[in-house]
Amino acid sequence: MGGEQFEQHDDREGPLELLQSLRSKATELLLREEWEESIQVYTKFIDLSRSQISKLGGSDPDPDPDLIHKLRKSLCLALCNRAEARAKLRDFVEAMMDCDQALEIESTHFKTLLCKGKVLLGLSKYASALECFKTALLDPQASDNLETVTGYMEKCKRLELQAKTGAFDLSDWILSGFRGRSPELAEFIGSIEIKKSETSGRGLFATKNIVAGTLILVTKAVATERGILGTGGEKAQLIMWKNFIEEVTESVKKCNRTHRLVSILSTGHDEDNLEIPDISIFRPDEAFETCGNSKQSLDTEKLLSILDVNSLVEDAVSAKVMGKNKEYYGVGLWTLASFINHSCLPNARRLHVGEYAIVHASRDIKAGEEITSAYFDVLSSPLEKRKEMAESWGFCCGCSRCKFESLLYVTNQEIRELEMGLERGVDAGNAVYMVEEGMKRWKVKGKDKGLLRASYWGVYDEIYSSERLMRRWGRKIPTMEVVVDSVSDVTGSDERLMKLLVEDVKKKNGGCSNITEMEKILKLGKGFYGKVVSKRKAMKTLLGLE
């Protein structure tokens, strides 16, 4: 890494000695992984090298061509090393500029091509990264690093395939017990578009029919912050929030594209007049040319409003954290996922894997239907409770479930009596029986039954989980399978629905189940975890059936 030694020449001795000293210091800092400090020293070395090359090539009446050549080679290497340090700090735009400047000096410089390929990978530019690694193979040094280069090439091909097809599979990672680092994933956008939402500002909408479990999008975080809250939860959260704001601010400063994507997010005000962006600007390959250091700073007040409205907690009611990060409290900003609005009839869930949010359909979605998730618990939550939770989030839900229950609540005294009975602690069996008999009298049919069963899921769960209550009420109420089907049909797959079925299977015949029961559980599992778990054994492991 240190490059060639400079010969010492009479009046040039001072600057050349300084260059040698700067290069040694920068190399030492790079090896010690002190990225910021190494960047500072490399910058001094680069500026002085350019000054010396300019002086030797211009005003010097007797330039030394060998010295100029050595200076240029050292400058190329210094730019490459500074790019490497910048990439470690995720300053990919500046790193790319350094790589391009180094390649202007030596277009086939192996180390720079390798570095540029890795930077392009960091920018989710898989095809361009592959071309870099292919060019690097032409260098004689590639023979000593063949395994490394071919490894990167295979990664590019795998990620490019994921980005184009949405063919992700986490099965092997799951079966390993989440050993090692989280898998590196590609960014992916499925059959969706951004449109004006009838319920709240802008939203994501399906452009084709989407089957339950199908990937909708995979997106990398602008920034995340994680930690263990412990006993001082509130104080720890405030520290995390401060760090998170600083990380987002830094990311916005480093890249025009990030600045643009964060700037168009909602601040919670003037929702009706917000720009409707084209989905293509969220594709890394489409927007790459707009990258560069942001000359504009995002107004602090606006940024805080954006983060307040759009930040996502990883371990949320509609999300599941996979791998080692599930041990931590985490918050992050995923720009495209921020367009997903709330509904009490959600059709999407997300998984968090490393820095990525993976959004999939939790039930079948029709073309033209809005992609929604639950911001709060919509099971065991009657209308009034959901209204309170929506208010705490700062909005009023106008989904079809809320409209249906509002009408029923206004016109039916029995519903109000039922809720008062639940508050007094009425027997779960009685409560379920009252709901089921009431639906017959109120002429509630089809999917609407699932809406009310979801609202009073707590008492259904209690009765189906109790052998004593089932002996008493089992013949008077619908079977567990019927109720689970009707609830999942309207609210999507939920961990509690799966758990009930799994526990029931474990009670029967020592955990043996028939094909129909197993397929029902696996179908719910697909809606909960998505089709990123293709191996049956991996899904059964997640469901606690292995």
Residue ranges and their predicted role:
Residues 123, 173-176, 197-200, 207-351, ...:
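SET-domain substrate-recognition elements in eukaryotic SAM-dependent protein methyltransferases
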Residues 140-198, 206:
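Ankyrin-repeat-protein effector appendages
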Residues 19-31, 39-46, 79, 186-208, ...:
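Eukaryotic beta-rich interaction modules
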Residues 12, 64-65, 71, 99-100, ...:
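Eukaryotic intrinsically disordered and solvent-exposed regulatory patches
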Residues 15, 24, 144-145, 152, ...:
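C-terminal SET catalytic tail plus cysteine-rich post-SET Zn-binding segment of SAM-dependent SET-domain
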Residues 200-204, 219-223, 228, 529-534, ...:
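A eukaryotic intrinsically disordered, low-complexity regulatory tract that is acidic and Ser/Pro-rich
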